[in-house]
Amino acid sequence: MNPNQKIITIGSVSLTIATICFLMQIAILVTTVTLHFKQYECDSPANKQVMPCEPIIIERNITEIVYLTNTTIEKEICPKLVEYRNWSKPQCKITGFAPFSKDNSIRLSAGGDIWVTREPYVSCDPGKCYQFALGQGTTLDNKHSNDTIHDRTPHRTLLMNELGVPFHLGTRQVCIAWSSSSCHDGKAWLHVCVTGYDKNATASFIYDGRLVDSIGSWSQNILRTQESECVCINGTCTVVMTDGSASGRADTKILFIEEGKIVHISPLSGSAQHVEECSCYPRYPGVRCICRDNWKGSNRPVVDINVKDYSIDSSYVCSGLVGDTPRNNDRSSSSYCRNPNNEKGTHGVKGWAFDDGNDVWMGRTISEDSRSGYETFKVIGGWSTPNSKLQINRQVIVDSDNRSGYSGIFSVEGKSCINRCFYVELIRGREQETRVWWTSNSIVVFCGTSGTYGTGSWPDGADINLMPI
């Protein structure tokens, strides 16, 4: 090869290598620009929000490092867009209930600073469940705990902790309240907090940590609400509130709330005669509530709420095995779906049930006369057949020798269905246990399961003789 040919060959090879390097640099540049401007896909439309990181809100806080030759590129991961919950999935098919959580608050109070509470409940945001209760403004081992049997004082506040975390001194006080309800619409928490004088109380509506709206007493007789979770569908939250006699005719209204603002109020309609302390659950496209008739019936009222047109209907659970306390024994109790049964209707206790096709799952105290023991079961035809009494899948949650109290429902959305869970309030102290001067509670929580399960009893478990007086 002569010198000229060598020069041409070397030049050709050099040009080829230079071309390849140039193309590689272009590819790297294009990749860099593409990944850099990919972040603009993260921009949210006006009606979207960025999922907050807890406890400090940091958006786009995850960085993935990608190495290309000697170039380092930072690729931002888009934050998850948050939308309103619609609860459109079907209800989970269950065989019964399995243990989920127990906070042991009273036992822990024997040696620690734990709040005095009552009226607990559970509610979940899309990622986590929380327990709520109405605190008495004092811990148990504190002289202020004397005489905390009273329901309504200006010191009571709504407490909120992760489920399973007892209400210790670091617990957040969400609002001032002696009656409350809370729910998460998919974007933020709504808290309904009632406080004030019996004859002129105020309900405050707190959304995303801000006071947005309020309403005053409309019947001047202890404005009160659910003492369990409200329900939000597509941004509209519903809460049942009652003002009026606890043992006679009262004025019940259903409030529709959007981001903390009252947008509509519907009066109770249908055949229910008295409605208090409703336990509500999403039944897409509406909301269904099982409540307490404190006047005429030991069968539980049903309130059906249409979220789209604000219409309301009401009736009673058809099951002849009724859910309130006090009640007749199962042989003589009755319910015919439309009206109160007029069987030991005066007084009562907050409770729950939910429909399962034509059947009904329900919980109640084991005692017919007192808040002792707790059981769950399914009544075949209990949702559709008047006075149905065929009971299956009975479980004991708290044995009959131990105290129970209020109970309520909450719903948890899974990947393919919506599960129903419930909590039981385990009351201790006055009036029954007169060695001490306080009244407080712990809770136990169960959730629906499609699996098998065993037996047991999950009472509060504190030895009253070891407790502060």
Swiss-Prot record:
One of its GO terms (cellular component) is host cell plasma membrane. Keywords: Calcium, Disulfide bond, Glycoprotein, Glycosidase, Host cell membrane, Host membrane, Hydrolase, Membrane, Metal-binding, Signal-anchor, Transmembrane, Transmembrane helix, Virion. One of its GO terms (biological process) is carbohydrate metabolic process. Its cofactor is Ca(2+). Glycans are attached at N61, N70, N86, N146, N200, N234, N402. The chain crosses the membrane at residues 10-30. N-glycosylated. This is Neuraminidase. Belongs to the glycosyl hydrolase 34 family. Signal peptide: none annotated. It is found in: Virion membrane; Host apical cell membrane. Residues 31-469 are virion surface. The active site is at D151, Y406. The keyword ATP-binding does not apply. It comes from Influenza A virus (strain A/Beijing/39/1975 H3N2). The influenza A genome consist of 8 RNA segments. Genetic variation of hemagglutinin and/or neuraminidase genes results in the emergence of new influenza strains. The mechanism of variation can be the result of point mutations or the result of genetic reassortment between segments of two different strains.
